[in-house]
């Protein structure tokens, strides 16, 4: 049989390193390990819905819960699942993401792992940037296939959840699937913004509709209440739909074949076509999952970390969330009142009142300041006394939040300089505002990175 060159630049026969050390056939082994699974994390698009947080960074690089980045979630899930071979595909504003990955994830020579960043590039055979999730994977197949693996796990870089990926890969193997999609029961309101599907009694997916908008279409996709027991859904739940989590497991050969075309997106093109022709199965996930796609969802997911019983548990040391070790000192709190708040490493808080807020690393908060439902990203470094004096001489506040400020329902991005007697609140303003000093998105004020808010400003 002659060699056939695919659109991805990959030949069907004679793949790099495929012969030597070729994995055993699926039927001969069912265990999941670092040698037979390769993980690919999608770095995301331009992140327009998270703007201005994505003005200078990619979505996966957006800070999370005080000290982490969004990308730490899928990477930590992989590490906790024993899967240590990861590729991260990036394209937009990726400099800070590259710095974070290179400083946070260094496997030793004996661990058999890596987190390798593959930035979008132009080559003699590829002249365009990534056009979608499937296109990004297609353009990097040549790199993936330099590894021995039977299954490829494709993940999103901007979701909050904790999952043992060995379970979905094991289910994929046991069902003899060609593609397995992680799915989640959701209510009607979010269903219109997700890929919704139906499955039969064997969990094989029989129908898939990307972001259904028509009420009649949604009604036809409802989970039958008789299935609630099988899916471990409480009987009192109503109108549930089976949504794609954007997490996929593909057989190696299946992925190569499905990408032998010019389709650009998994959800819009690849998955609907595969359901008609392939063995595509659902793996139902019952835990907490949040798509951090908008300012509102990002804001609420972060503030939830300060609640009595957070939906996502950062304190679970059986499956910890890893990040860049900064070796910062403990936070110093002088006479402050703090209730339902998360205070990250290295903060200095002087006689402030903080409620239901999340304070990021190296944050400085002056005396008399009140924060209510506020997220601060903190600073990249501590200012020296000389730097503070120079800033004051130039008429700029120091990095952090000054004295006697009142801030509510706001996100303060990194290295922002907020002066004394500043008031920040979205109350009485439009839901979406663009201003030279601030933005309002979904009714939440966002102070951008490196912003300077003078003394006495009222927002």
Q: Where does each model-flagged region fall?
A:
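Conserved N-terminal catalytic core of the sugar/cofactor nucleotidyltransferase
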Residues: 2-4, 10-41, 49-171, 199-201, ...
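Conserved beta-strand termini and adjacent loop/short-helix elements that scaffold enzyme active sites
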Residues: 118-120, 182, 283-285
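Short, well-ordered beta-strand micro-motif
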Residues: 63, 183, 198, 249-251, ...
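Conserved core of the sugar-phosphate nucleotidyltransferase
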Residues: 105, 162-249, 261-262
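Short internal beta-strands
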Residues: 88-90, 183, 411
